[in-house]
């Protein structure tokens, strides 16, 4: 069990099975989780990406899946549900949900913290109220990822992904500076931190791969 500080006043208990919890025991550049359908892989993407957004908002992340259908209908659907359940984050809407924490494919509202980046387009970008940015992508069209730099990545259902997409494109994009292994887990739960954090250790750009058995 992990306790997540969703804000300054509330602690939320998160139940993780052992393979899920193992991802947060140590900071590592490559992290592989193999599980059958329904084993909680996408749920763990929601938890892990939420931690990076919460603790390392200045570092851009990427969430990708093998196909666009997989990305939109499963990976992101589960991720958004996990963000709401664990962190209390929902999509911002000026009229329907003015207290929302993120926007998708659109310019963030003025009250969101400035993320400090210049992007040609807002397509496939998720912007958060604390200034964090996460790209989303389909690995069936992996060449569109070329040219971007990210600090961490989470890939879902990669069993059928072309090897070049992983070895040449994704790993080559993991080079944004600003993310380090934490000498001591932040809040006792998260082994990564910004490079300017007092607990910052060696620089790292972690890649998390979640896939089914071959």
Task: Describe the residue ranges of each PLM region.
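Phosphate/NTP-binding elements of NTP-utilizing enzymes
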Residues: 1-214
